[in-house]
C-alpha cells in the first residue's frame, strides 16, 4: 500500500532534551508511533544497548509506539520502518560500537515499547546490559526470538496468546532470564541456549496442545517449572549422574514422568548440558 504523505497517517518521531541532569549528563526524550491501518502482520526488531526496557501490548489503534529517555552522548534512537515488508526496528544503538558500558547515565535510560494486539507479531529482541520486562499477554505472537547479554530479563505470557506461535527462541549469555507462563504462549516449540547465568522456564498457563523444548546449557543453572498434570519426557545427550528429577523414571538417558501415559498434554524435552545444573519443579 502506498504511504500517504499526511503526518497523522505516518509514524511520528520527536526528541526533546530532558530537564534533569544526571551525573553531568541530561537525558533526552524521544517518541515515535505509527497508526494501525489494518496491517495483517508486523515483523518487529528491538535493539537495546543498556538501561531499562519495558515491552507490552499497546492501544489497538497504534501499530507500534516507543518512548525513550536516553543518554544522547553515547546512544542514539533507532526507528526504521520498511513499508514493503511491514518491518520495524526500534530501540537504542551505541554511538561507539566498541565501547558500550553501564556507567554514567546508561543505567538510567528507559525504553517503553508497545505493539498492536491486532496484527500478527513476529518479534525479535536483542538486549545488552539491560533490565527488561516483556509482557506478551494480549498480543498475537506468531514467533519470538530473545537474545540477552549481561542482563536481567523477565518475559511474561500473562494472558493466552491470541494465535498459534510456531517457535520461541531464547539465547542468554551471562544473564538472568525468567520466562513465565509458557503454557499461555501456544508455541509449538521452545528452544533455549544458555552460557553462564540463572534461567527459569515456567510452563504455567492454559495449555491447548503438546509442545517441545530444546535446551542447551553450558554453565549456570536451569530451572524447569512444569504443571503436575502435564506428561513430561526428558532426553539427555548423555547420562547425567547428578540429574535425578523427582517424579520420573529413567531408562538410560531418557526420563519419563509417572503420569506421562495418562496425561492429556505433553512436554517433550531435549536436554544438552556440560557443567550446568538442571532442576525440575512441579506446579500444583
Residue ranges and their predicted role:
Residues 124-163:
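Right-handed parallel beta-helix
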Residues 50, 128, 277:
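Extracellular/lumenal glycan-associated surfaces
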Residues 7-17:
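Bacterial N-terminal signal peptides
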Residues 1-5:
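Positively charged n-region of N-terminal signal peptides that target proteins for export
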Residues 45-47, 123-127, 134-135, 214-216, ...:
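A structural feature that tracks compact, well-ordered secondary-structure segments
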Residues 30-57:
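N-terminal targeting signals for Sec/Tat export/insertion, comprising classic cleavable signal peptides
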Residues 81-87, 94, 112-113, 119-123, ...:
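Pepsin/retropepsin-fold aspartyl endopeptidases
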